[in-house]
Amino acid sequence: MGFVLTTSGQMQIVVRDDAAAMTKLLKLPVSKRLGSLAAMRGVSEFDEPAMKQLRQIHERGDGFRVGVDDPRYPAALKRLIEADAWGQLKRDLARAWEYQQSVLPGIHHAETVDVVLTLGNPDDPVFIERTLGYYGMGSIPGSIWMVAWPTDYNVTRIGACGVHELAHNIRTPNVEGHFDLEEWVIHEGLAEVFTVEVCGPDSTGAWYAPVTGKLLESTWKKVTEAFGTGRSFPDWTPYVLGDEVAGRMGLRPVGVPHMGGYAVGREIIERYLAATGLKAAQAIVRPTDEILAGAGLKPRTKS
């Protein structure tokens, strides 16, 4: 989607409260649900690339299945509504942007950020058990997309997940150079620590909580030794998201635990912040090489 960048400090965060529309959608015949979903998302059914992406999410990805009449769906949607998931997003994203502006005004940002939360697929064990039933994508300025299947853990952290994605939205237009594995790992580390600064220490981190001690040491070595390698996301994904996600995408495993790159990224950022005295909201615009050096890592020559 298109977006307009500014340094005004005025960001309009538009959280699409689709709860009522999704409730109606789930009462429709299965044959009409994809069209209804497209209308909710502002997608023309004649826009083949957009419809293909929508089908990918809701037929093979982590979105709820548009071709299935599943009695669990209305109950799950009701639980998101009762948890005020969309309200969480509105409040926490507004608070996060206010915090960012108080710490470092004058940075580049999208004038408007469009935020979408959709219901997830309960039958994917990696999504439910390992990714804890929720995640988002927010690296394209002006857009945050999130998916959730409500659980006891995630229903109070939907807003925090949005804050993580807002950090990506903020960093992308403020750093120059090409995207690579190092930048992806730093993106995730910054987003995690930024979320902690805004929402507190218990708001995030469970995805990679087991990656500590000796496992973190071995993962650190595996991931940082891959810096400077690869040319695209299929090359880097196993080092960031881990072998389980890589395997389901048909990619080569590299010996990294689930979300191991997040744990490494957070460790890099925490080392950098300790060395500089900065906060993540200040470091969010700092160059990759500076952050790596501050964390005691040498930038690697690209191969």
Give short role names for the model-derived ranges.
Residues M1-G87:
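N-terminal low-structure segments adjacent to metalloprotease catalytic domains
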Residues G2-D18, L181-A226, R300:
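Post-HExxH zinc-binding segment in Zn-dependent metallohydrolases
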Residues A38-D47, E225-S303:
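Pan-zinc metallopeptidase signature
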Residues L77-P141, V155:
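Auxiliary, metal-adjacent structural segments of Zn-dependent hydrolase domains
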Residues Q101, A167, R171-V175, T195-S203, ...:
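Hydrophobic/aromatic-lined pockets within catalytic cores
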Residues M146-C161:
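Short pre-active-site segment immediately N-terminal to the catalytic Zn-binding motif
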Residues T151, N174-W184:
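Short helix/strand-bridging catalytic loops that position acidic/His residues to coordinate divalent metals
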Residues A160-P173, E188, E192:
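Active-site recognition of the HExxH zinc-binding catalytic motif
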